[in-house]
Swiss-Prot record:
Family that this chain belongs to: Belongs to the peptidase M17 family.
EC number, UniProt record: 3.4.11.1, 3.4.11.10
This protein's record includes keyword Endoplasmic reticulum: no
Residues that bind Mn(2+) 1: 274, 351, 353
Superkingdom of origin: Bacteria
Swiss-Prot/TrEMBL keywords: Aminopeptidase, Cytoplasm, Hydrolase, Manganese, Metal-binding, Protease
Location(s) in or outside the cell: Cytoplasm
The protein, known as: Probable cytosol aminopeptidase
Binding-site list for Mn(2+) 2: 269, 274, 292, 353
Record field: catalytic activity: Release of an N-terminal amino acid, Xaa-|-Yaa-, in which Xaa is preferably Leu, but may be other amino acids including Pro although not Arg or Lys, and Yaa may be Pro. Amino acid amides and methyl esters are also readily hydrolyzed, but rates on arylamides are exceedingly low; Release of an N-terminal amino acid, preferentially leucine, but not glutamic or aspartic acids
Active site per UniProt: 281, 355
Length: 499
């Protein structure tokens, strides 16, 4: 898909499809008003006749509009003018995509980016439009022998901005929007890939692929023998029951003006399949446990977006690849594991494996002397119960870092909600036989999981994103969401801007 921006007059657009907005009730946007004057009241006559009310998402396709050089004019309902939110704006853009896709038009000139969205600028309108278009056009058919038949997709979208002075911001939005939507698509592709293909070795090959593609990326892959030498016993215990060995992939992106600048480290839980191990999960929906590597997928997608944006930062992405399977050699409830930092952990449930993989990974990344560390993981069903499928759960030992992430989440419309940490939750992790238990009971399960991880992050500023509710969708819309690539990308953009 080719995207571009310009500042032009609506009446001069010679294109396959010209898109303008109509507010509720039957109120023309500025661009639609200009077309109405050019067509001598043709559009307003249709509205008075009741052909379009202007409710958000309604569409009306017009052909041969008098005096208008465009082949087609698509009117898109935008709801009430003063109540247009980011969510509604994206839905409007996606309705545009659906309508245009049915016409066979190859090019679209879109004036919806001139709409007033609450608290947003031309930059955000253009960037959100690109992300919404790519989201709408995304499909994953790699393993279908008969590909679904689709009409020719349009290949070019030209966004119009109302003021020439906004063109520079709009061009920047193009760059960021394309990079972030590419990163989201990469994350989705990896997460949607079946677990008999996407195993820890597959994740490692993807990480190597980034190094082959970008000169400022270097990838190191650590195998189980190296992990054993490092004392990553908790990580390895989870992997013991699987025929597929674990791999820890370290993707180093260096583009900071100061090559010695401390890196930002992103850690992703990469359980390419989680059966629960000996504490086996119910069979219902177990197929969705291929998504237990959503954290690693989002780190991979973010590193792709970062490389495309060429941000002047040093960033390290870590994919903690592993598989949790039942087997005669699998770890058991009652086992006591010695972690890489020396703390011992009593295993009370083998399905609380992500924190065991992450605790050793969080210790491992100390060697990079990071500016900060953010881990993301499909860690707990408890977070889904608490926050549903709309907000990722955020926990942090740093108020500054937490606020930066919450700000980025709001900016990117990739929402997160902060949950507490504290000594009272540490009490729930006490064990009679080890330093820690790997679960803290039913109450506050998402928080006690984050509290567990905090024991391994004492040497740097740290935040944890529990994406169990946001990394994928179930039911008829089953599939990966690519979250929180947008949030993380915005966080990195902000870091680059504030240096």
């Amino acid at each position: 898909m080719e995207f571009s921006v310009k500042n032009g007059s609506v009446e001069k657009q010679r294109t396959a499809c010209l898109v303008v907005g109509v507010y509720e009730p039957r109120r023309l946007s500025a661009a639609a008003e200009q077309l109405d004057k050019l067509s001598e009241g043709y559009i307003s006559t249709l509205l008075r006749r009741g052909d379009l009310e202007g409710k958000a998402g309604q569409t009306l396709l017009l052909h041969n509009v008098p005096n208008v050089p465009a082949d087609r004019v698509l009117l898109v309902g935008c709801g009430k003018e003063r109540e247009l939110t980011e969510r509604q704006y994206k839905q409007i853009i996606q309705k545009m995509v659906q309508a245009v896709s049915e016409t066979g038009s190859m090019e679209v000139v879109c004036f919806l980016t001139e709409l007033h969205v609450k608290g947003r600028t031309s930059y955000w309108n253009v960037r959100f439009a690109i992300e919404a278009i790519q989201e709408s056009l995304y499909s994953y058919n790699d393993f279908k022998s008969i590909k679904p038949e689709v009409r020719r997709e349009f290949r070019r979208v030209i966004f119009n901005v109302a003021n020439r002075k906004d063109l520079a911001d709009a061009e920047r939005a193009l760059e960021h929007g394309k990079a972030i939507s590419t990163g989201v698509a990469f994350a989705k592709n990896v997460a949607n890939c079946p677990p008999n293909v996407c195993n820890p070795a597959y994740l490692a090959e993807l990480a190597k692929g980034l190094a082959a593609e970008y000169d400022n990326i270097r990838t190191t892959v650590i195998d189980e023998a190296e992990m054993a030498a490092l004392g990553m016993n908790a990580y390895l215990a989870v992997s013991r029951g699987s025929q597929n060995p674990a791999y820890l992939s370290v993707i180093e992106y260096k583009n900071h003006p100061n090559p010695d600048a401390k890196p930002i480290v992103l850690v992703g839980k990469g359980l390419t399949f989680d059966s629960g191990g000996i504490s086996i999960k119910p069979s219902d929906s177990m197929d969705e446990m291929k998504y237990d590597m959503g954290g690693a997928a989002s780190v991979y997608g973010t590193m792709k977006a970062l490389a495309e944006m060429k941000l002047p930062l040093n960033v390290i992405g870590v994919l903690a690849g592993c598989e949790n399977m039942p087997d005669g050699n699998a770890y058991r409830p009652g086992d006591i594991l010695t972690t890489m930092n020396g703390l011992t952990v009593e295993v009370l449930n083998t399905d609380a494996e992500g924190r065991l993989v992450l605790c050793d990974t969080l210790t491992y990344v100390e060697r990079f002397e990071p500016e900060l560390v953010i881990d993301m993981a499909t860690l707990t069903g408890a977070c889904m119960i608490a926050l549903g499928a709309h907000n990722s759960g955020l926990m942090s030992t740093s108020n500054v870092l937490a606020n930066e992430l919450l700000n980025a989440a709001e900016q990117a419309d990739d929402k997160a909600w902060r949950l507490p940490l504290g000594e009272e939750y540490q009490e729930q992790l006490k064990s009679n036989f080890a330093d820690l238990a790997n679960i803290g009971g039913r109450l506050g399960g998402a928080i006690t999981a984050g509290q567990f991880l905090s024991n391994f992050t004492k040497k740097y500023s740290w935040a944890h994103l529990d994406i169990a509710g946001t990394a994928w969708k179930s039911g008829a819309a089953k599939g990966a969401t690519g979250r929180p690539v947008s949030l993380l990308s915005q966080f990195l953009i902000n870091k680059a801007n504030n240096q």
